[in-house]
Amino acid sequence: MYNWCYYHSSERHKTQGGIHMTADKVRLFFAGKGLADRITVRNEVSDTAEHSAAVIGCDIGQIAKTLSFLQDGKVVIILMSGEAKVDNKKYQHQFGLKSKMVPFAQVEDATGYAPGAVSPYLLKEGTEVYLDVSLRRYQVLYTAAGSLNSTVRLTMDELLDCTGAKGFVDVCKNWQPAAKAAS
């Protein structure tokens, strides 16, 4: 069984039965929605979209990676397709300010999740969640489920419902078929 503490030495990271306690909270959240069977826990750690897609056996675009940004003192989460990159011009047009990611060392304090395992569920109060339009081309998506070795499989409607997303934004590049062919 994967031991989260083995890979991350901070004393703040506690395990219960070998699984990070935030993963247990996410599991309980989905159990309450009747979706607990959608969570998969693996022995292998998947901390990047590329690795997650390989482990799951899906298209990298189906991995809804979760990026954390700071906006005027609040945290904003944007879920985007696994191969997408943030386009700073689009981000500034959408939000009216430059993109500023939460520094790696502050991710857990800002989101409640460790870097690489940020889940878009049960976030700290006041956190806003948006989905990038790059996700719309898929019927089934995968997100982190609170640990580096767990994912949850959801439809787009389920993802919208479970995240409480404020809506869709268009802040990414390198995901459109034409853009991928040109790069």
Regions found by a protein language model. Name each.
Residues 2-8, 14-183:
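Extended, low-hydrophobicity, polar/charged segments
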